[in-house]
Curated annotation (Swiss-Prot):
Biological process annotations from GO: cell adhesion
Disruption phenotype annotation: Loss of bacteria adhesion to human HeLa cells.
Gene: aidA
Coiled-coil blocks: none
Transmembrane region(s): 1006-1012, 1030-1040, 1048-1058, 1080-1087, 1098-1108, 1127-1138, 1153-1164, 1187-1198, 1211-1221, 1243-1253, 1260-1267, 1276-1284
Segments on the Extracellular face: 1013-1029, 1059-1079, 1109-1126, 1165-1186, 1222-1242, 1268-1275
Impact upon substituting residue 849 to A: Slight reduction in autocleavage
GO cellular component terms attached to this protein's record: cell outer membrane; cell surface; extracellular region; periplasmic space
Taxonomic source organism: Escherichia coli
Impact when changing residue 879 to A: No effect on autocleavage
UniProt-recorded name of the protein: Autotransporter adhesin AIDA-I
Signal peptide span: 1-49
Effect on the protein upon substituting residue 873 to A: No effect on autocleavage
């Protein structure tokens, strides 16, 4: 029976699935090709039963439960699909004019195409997977476009709907009369036309492109969706919801509503079109053309709108427009805001009913009208622009540039306008302009009924008669103000930069920008002087309550009087001879100058204010606040200050003056200043012939100046930083240096009461000091090459001398040191008492300094530190030369400065004494150089000088040289590094249980642990060494080869760790040095047996190792010296194994007696790095490339006890004797001297021990060895070994 297949849409799979049932259909039925059907179904995801293929079918009805499938390049036309019926078009199938009725469906799949399908109410057309539907009519029916489906020219009406799913595409859809298009996420609709009662709902980010909305049509854009290049005609509507974006919309009479959270970009509004922006919406770059409107509601914000001619932007309560470009109209209504608007080319900005505009710029032919409570701030009117301030309008901070105009009338108010060159302000009837500033060539016109209560203008000429009282005015240079008569108010025209006032009263004048007010008589009240404005008060005139601001000046000339002037920052009052000023207040930055013959009374100088009172001037009852500045001289008269009653200047004497913040006191010739204090930025100037006494203190960054200063009191320098003091200082007083900085002095300093350095330091540079000096703790002085101190020095801090001369005694209770230069020579023409430290070697490279004193006394615990390049008698060294006597006791600390050491004969002179040599000097530290120790002795070896003190490299009262014990430590490390890892074949191979010559074991591992002690002597005859050592070596055979004719070959690897600690004692000086050595080795070895290792025959062995060590040497009183050694050692040797005798005991146990003559040669190539000790000695190894030869014989017995008769255990006791010869003796070369370990050239060695086989694979051994050579050299060691064979 033929089978048919119905198909059911699966929402979960988003595909058609097959259901089997009986089939009926029209056209060509291919029921028997069931397999083919299933194959097609499997490729396209659909099922079908009635197939149309290879022919064209016309007409036909697909009834309930039937499926018609159209495929394979043929088609069907005029089919009718009724309720429950399905038509499937795919795989090249094509249908035309299909009618799909209620509950019928047409499915267009891969490569299927339909044209002019009619889908009635309840019917559905599905287009997916490469299917194409063209010119479908949805008369109440539905069309769904799925992924890769495409529909074009669909017509939707009578409640029909089109849904575009992700990946679906539609083009040129026409929607009308209740039709609806829904663009789901991922779907795309382009060129859709929406007619009356049609609707498009957009939910896709890809959205709708080039939609055309006619009258009555609606487009709704939802969150996350986009609509691009939509055209909305008259009566059409576009709604942009929260999260949606509309870009490039054209409103050609239609409406766009942008809701909260919605965004519209680059909208164009034409004739009768309206864009409405609601709260929370964002709209940018809208263009409003002729007849178009942009309405901004409460909370809405738009930016960069362009309004062209006859277009309108309406800003309602709470709405805001930013950076609009207005060539049409902008209307700012109640509580609306416009910011940074540009108005030009016939554009109007209307600000009314409480609207606000800020930062508007008005260019050529632009207009701004402010009325009915409107407010505009910071408007800029450029050339050709106009601002009108009308009834109840208010403009603040308007800037009028060249040819810009502001009209104020009918109750309008302009405040603080700035009228620049060419700018114009017109004030008409009932208009008011307050606080305008009219700059150069600006113009302000006040017409009849206009008011300008506080006039900022550029006034040039003003004449005030005795009966007149002018308005307040600010006076600038070059401008013009014209005031016309209204209701009897006077008028005047100001044309010059001079305002002259004759008998009468003027008040409230403002004089600016080089303007000038001349008061020849009468009273001037309340003048304000700004920006280089000037007021001159002549004889007969009085100025009261003047205020001097930045660069404002008031000049009080002879006969002129001022009262109550206030001088602010930059303001100045100058009182000339015959002028008088009273009650002047000087604030921060203000200044009052009182010249010779001028008089001021009651001046109040605040913090930061300045008063200058010249010689011949007087300042009475002045009040100088803290931080106020006083400039005066001893020739002025300042009898007292109300705040400091003790301060006075009169009759060439100033007392208790405090100078700060620029304050100046000049002490003139013959004048005296007593108890002067100079604080930060204060200045004290002392002319030649002027004197300071009492306590003069210079603090912080205060300044004292003068070429010859006479100080008869306490002169205290307490400055904050380092400074130079380049003046002559004389007098009967004392100079006290009390700040932490450094003072550099060059000149002649004479102070009868001395110089006291309490803190910081003084550098005397080319100075002559005629005074006793005291250097306190934490203070210092540096006496340079060219400086001379004529006086005693008491040092509790630090003194640095160079090529200096001190003509006086020194008591040193701290540090007296040379500078860091080389070969310095200082002279003390007086006695030196040393209670602490004298340092002649401040660096490790300063050898050669000489200190010459008249007499020297040392107290117990005192130290003299010297240095030198230690070699022989002529070593370069620091020296103390005493022209007179020495007494007391001092320690000597001597430092070798990279000297290589050498043998001395007469000694190295470090202290020379010409008088009585009663002082005792002793070395406090150990002095070494090269291979030698140095000692200190009084007198030289030849006996020609029994007063001086000498360093010698021989033992006291003996010609024997003192060799350092470090020689032995270095030599021992050298020897050990080359010998610790030595071994021979017997120490490595171990005894085996096998006695035949079968194939040897395939591999083995072994370990040897050795401990021992060795001792020896150096060839200097003074130093003996003792060393303990520990060695752990392990290895293993990694390759074995056996050949009947060639013998047995073995290759192995080995490594080891060793450490040693030793001590060398010099038995002549009792000084000692300790050495340590630890390191590692890695190497390879090889052996050959002629007939196997347990048979009679020849054998040979060789090995090579790389060794590296860390070493140290620590001598008594010296720094620990650390260095490295590394290098190769290699060995070659051989011998003959001989079974001398074999026997069998009564118990049946076999024993053997063996002899083994052998020979071994070892090359030793481990060397140390060249090392320089802390004292400069260069250390190198001696005995490099030594070849050690060992020849000997070994006897052994293979035995087994009766207890072990039936086991594999066997033992081999042995004894061995060797002769050892070394081609070189190991040692050390320290600078140019070499010391060797004696007795190591030829040595004898005895070994004994036992080897045992525990199991077939495990063997152990133990033994002791003793070596002995000449000069008492010997070594004893014990070893344990273990070997495991595989």
């Amino acid at each position: 029976m033929n089978k048919a297949y119905s198909i059911i849409w699966s929402h979960s799979r988003q595909a058609w699935i097959v259901a089997s049932e009986l089939a009926r259909g029209h056209g060509f039925v291919l029921a028997k090709n069931t397999l083919l059907v299933l194959a097609v179904v499997s490729t396209i995801g659909n099922a079908f039963a009635v197939n149309i293929s290879g022919t064209v079918s016309s007409g036909g009805t697909v009834s309930s439960g039937e499926t018609q499938i159209v495929y394979s390049g043929r088609g069907n036309s005029n089919a009718t699909v009724n309720s429950g019926g399905t038509q499937i078009v795919n795989n090249g199938g094509k249908t035309t004019a299909t009618t799909v009725n209620s509950s019928g469906s047409q499915n267009v799949g891969t490569s299927g195409a339909t044209i002019s399908t009619i889908v009635n109410s309840g019917g559905i057309q599905r287009v997916s997977s490469g299917g194409v539907a063209s010119a479908t009519n949805l008369s109440g029916g539905a069309q769904n476009i799925y992924n890769l489906g495409h529909a074009s020219n669909t017509v939707i009406f009578s409640g029909g709907n089109q849904t575009i799913f992700s990946g679906g595409i539609t083009d040129s859809t026409n929607i009308s009369s209740g039709g609806q298009q829904r663009v789901s996420s991922g779907g795309v609709a382009s060129n859709t036309t929406i007619n009356s009662s049609g609707a498009q709902n957009i939910l896709s980010e890809e959205g709708a492109i080039s939609t055309h909305i006619s009258s009555g049509g609606n487009q709704y854009i939802s969150a996350g969706a986009n609509a691009t290049e939509t055209i909305v005609n008259s009566g059409g509507f576009q709604r942009v919801n929260s999260g949606a974006v509309a870009t490039g919309t054209v409103l050609s009479g239609g409406t766009q509503n942008v809701s909260s959270g919605g965004s519209a970009i680059s909208t164009s509004v034409y004739n009768s079109g309206v864009q409405t922006v609601f709260a929370g919406a964002t709209v940018t770059d809208t263009t409003v053309n002729s007849g178009g409107n942009q309405n901004i509601s409460s909370g809405g914000i738009v930016s960069e709108t362009t309004v062209n001619v006859s277009g309108t932007q309406n800003i309602y309560s709470g709405g805001s427009a930013l950076s609009a470009n207005i060539k049409g109209s902008q209307i700012v209504n109640s509580e609306g805001t416009a910011i940074n608007t540009l108005v030009s080319d016939g554009g109007y900005q209307h600000i009314r009913n409480g609207g606000i505009a800020s930062g508007t710029i008005v260019n050529q032919s632009g207009y701004v009208n402010i009325s009915s409570g409107g407010y505009a701030e910071s408007t800029i009117i450029n050339s050709g622009g106009t601002l009108r301030v009308l009834s109840d309008g208010y403009a603040r901070g308007t800037i009028l540039n060249n040819s810009g105009r502001e009209n104020v009338s009918n109750g309008g108010v302009s405040y603080n306008a700035m009228i620049n060159t060419g700018g114009n302000q017109y004030i008409y009837s009932d208009g008011e302009a307050t606080a305008a500033i009219v700059n150069t060539s600006g113009f302000q016109r006040i017409n009849s009924g206009g008011t300008a209560p506080v006039q900022n203008s550029v006034v040039v000429t003003r004449t005030v008669s005795s009966a007149a009282k002018p308005f307040d005015a600010e006076v600038y240079s070059g401008g013009k103000q014209t005031v016309y008569l209204w209701r009897g108010i006077w008028y005047s025209n100001f044309l010059t930069a001079v305002w002259s006032m004759f008998p009468g009263t003027a008040s409230g004048a403002n004089v600016n920008l080089s303007g000038r007010l001349n008061a020849f008589a009468g009273n001037v009240v309340g003048t304000i002087l700004n920006q280089e404005g000037r007021q001159y008060v002549y004889s007969g005139a009085t100025a009261t309550s003047t205020v001097g601001n930045n660069e404002g000046r008031e000049y009080v000339l002879s006969g002129g009087i001022t009262d109550g002037t206030v001088l602010n920052s930059g303001g100045l009052q100058a009182v000339s001879s015959g002028g008088k000023a009273s009650a002047t207040v000087i604030n921060e930055g203000g200044a009052q100058f009182v010249y010779d013959g001028g008089q001021v009374t009651g001046t109040n100088i605040k913090n930061g204010g300045t008063i200058r009172v010249d010689s011949g001037a007087s300042a009475l009852n002045i009040a100088l606040s803290s931080g106020g500045n006083l400039f005066t001289s001893t020739g002025a008269t300042l009898p007292e200050l109300t705040t400091m009653a003790a301060l006075s200047v009169s009759q060439n004497h100033a007392s208790n003056i405090v100078l700060e913040n620029g304050g100046l006191l000049r002490v003139t010739s013959g004048g005296t200043a007593t108890d002067t204090t100079v604080n930060s930025a204060g200045r004290l100037r002392i002319d030649d012939g002027g004197t300071i006494n009492g306590t003069t203190t210079i603090n912080a960054d205060g300044i004292v100046a003068g070429t010859n200063i006479q100080n008869d009191g306490n002169f205290i320098l307490n400055l904050a930083e380092n400074y130079d003091f380049e003046t002559e200082l004389s007098g009967s007083g004392v100079l006290v240096k009390d700040n932490t900085g450094i003072m550099t002095y060059a000149g002649t300093l004479t102070q009868a009461q001395g110089v006291n350095v309490k803190n910081g330091g003084i550098i005397f540079d080319s100075a002559v000091v005629n005074a006793d000096m005291a250097v306190n703790q934490n203070a210092y002085i540096n006496i340079s090459d060219q400086a001379t101190i004529n006086g005693s020095v008491n040092n509790n801090g630090s003194i640095v001398i160079n090529n200096s001369i001190i003509n006086g005694n020194i008591t040193n209770d701290a540090d007296l040191s040379f500078g860091t230069a080389k070969l310095l020579s200082a002279t003390v023409n007086g006695s030196l008492v040393n209670n602490k430290n004298i340092i002649l070697n401040p660096t490790k490279e300063s050898a050669g300094n000489t200190l010459t004193v008249s007499n020297y006394t040392g107290t117990p615990g005192s130290v003299i530190s010297l240095g030198g390049v230690l070699e022989g008698d002529n070593s370069l060294t620091d020296r103390l030369v005493v022209k007179g006597n020495t007494s007391g006791q001092s320690d000597i600390v001597y430092v070798n400065e990279d000297g290589s050491g050498g043998q001395t004969r007469d000694g190295i002179n470090i202290i020379s004494v010409e008088g009585n040599s009663d002082a005792e000097f002793s070395l406090k530290n150990r002095v070494v150089a090269g291979a030698y120790d140095y000692t200190l002795q009084k007198g030289n070896e030849s006996g020609t000088d029994n007063k001086g003190w000498y360093l010698t490299s021989h033992l006291p009262t003996s010609d024997t040289r003192q060799y350092r014990p470090e020689n032995g430590s270095y030599a021992t490390n050298m020897a050990l590094a080359n010998s610790l890892f030595l071994m021979d074949l017997n120490e490595r191979k171990q005894f085996r249980a096998m006695s035949d010559n079968t194939q040897p074991e395939s591999a083995s591992v072994w370990m040897k642990i050795t401990g021992g002690i060795s001792s020896g002597k150096l060839n200097d005859g003074q130093n003996k060494t003792t060393t303990n050592q520990f060695i752990n070596q392990l290895g293993g055979d990694i390759y074995k080869f056996h050949a009947e004719q060639l013998g047995d070959f073995t290759l192995g690897i080995m490594g080891g760790y060793a450490n040693a600690k030793g001590k060398t004692i010099n038995y002549t000086s009792n000084k000692a040095a300790r050495n340590t050595l630890d390191g590692y080795s890695v190497g390879v070895y090889g052996t050959w047996y002629q007939n196997g290792e347990n048979a009679t025959g020849l054998f040979a062995e060789t090995w090579m190792q790389y060794n590296w060590f860390n070493a140290s040497v620590k001598g008594d009183g010296l720094e620990e010296e650390k260095y490295n050694l590394n290098g190769l050692t290699a060995s070659a040797g051989g011998g003959y194994n001989l079974n001398v005798h074999t026997w069998t005991s009564p118990e049946g146990i076999t024993g053997e007696f063996w002899l083994q003559p052998h020979l071994q040669a070892v090359w030793m190539g481990v060397t140390p790095d060249t090392h320089q000790e802390d004292n400069g000695t260069v250390v190198q190894g001696a005995g490099k490339n030594n070849i050690q030869t060992k020849a000997g014989i070994r006897a052994s017995w293979k035995v087994k006890s009766t207890l072990d008769k039936d086991t594999g255990r066997r033992f081999r006791p042995y004894i061995e004797a060797n002769w050892i010869h070394n081609t070189h003796e190991f040692g050390v070369k320290m600078s140019d001297d070499s010391q060797l370990l004696s007795g190591s050239r030829n040595q004898g060695e005895i070994k004994t021990g036992i080897e045992g086989v525990i199991t077939q694979n495990l063997s152990v051994n133990g033994g002791v060895a003793y070596q002995a050579g000449g000069h008492g050299s010997n070594a004893i060691s014990g070893a344990l070994g273990i070997k495991y064979s595989f």
